[in-house]
Amino acid sequence: MLRRAARTVGQLLLPAHCAACGSPAPPDGRWPLCAACARDLADLLSAPYCPACGRHAGPYTAGPDGCAFCRQYPVPFDAAVRAGAYGGPLKTLVLRCKYGPRPALATVLGRLLAERLALAGWADHVDRIVPVPLHWSRRVRRGFNQALGMARELVRAVPGAGRVDRRTLVRTRPTAHQTGIPAARRRQNVRGAFRVRRGTDLAGETVLLVDDVMTSGTTVAECTRVLKRAGAGDVYVAVAATADFDDPGPW
């Protein structure tokens, strides 16, 4: 019975077909991808990015003090880490996880992110891991929160965090999907959409905020401001992917 259960879990995490392109080629043994998609994923994971804001950055164009973009528009959070650039098989994994829906892929995305998080010099200082919440109505329709599934995989990379606290942040109202919305409307869309749950003591804590994709950054920026107003010290951001955004502006 235990062997059968283990095999079932293995099939969920490492299906017989590539989770990105659907080819029947067997996964490479580590990720649920064929060899070709695994190579493409490796390129996405190695793309340089700014450690301050998480946006794409060319080689030698960003450092601990940020990149040209976040020097112009300072970020409200203290640093960011990502698994890779939003494209190719990584984009497919994110979309299939969220809309498939395939909750098991949140585990895969979380493991990809955990490898990058373990390299961050600030990771050992995290006190609690907080996934960006869905509004209850969307969570009911989707059946799960992909950010929560990813966050659970990060506990091993951040031993000091102890556990994921999914109750810290509350989404107070449903918000429109951010896709295709200009930056100014994105900021308005999420303004006032989050609060810290009553009775939560964040005084001086270092928080790791987790989400699947960061495009304009308005969602994680709003969550960061809410957490800091409630007393959090440093707030770091971890996302599976960051996407290009044609209309950047203040956070």
Predicted regions and their residues:
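Glycine-rich phosphate/pyrophosphate-handling loop used in enzymes and phosphotransfer proteins
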Residues: 1-251
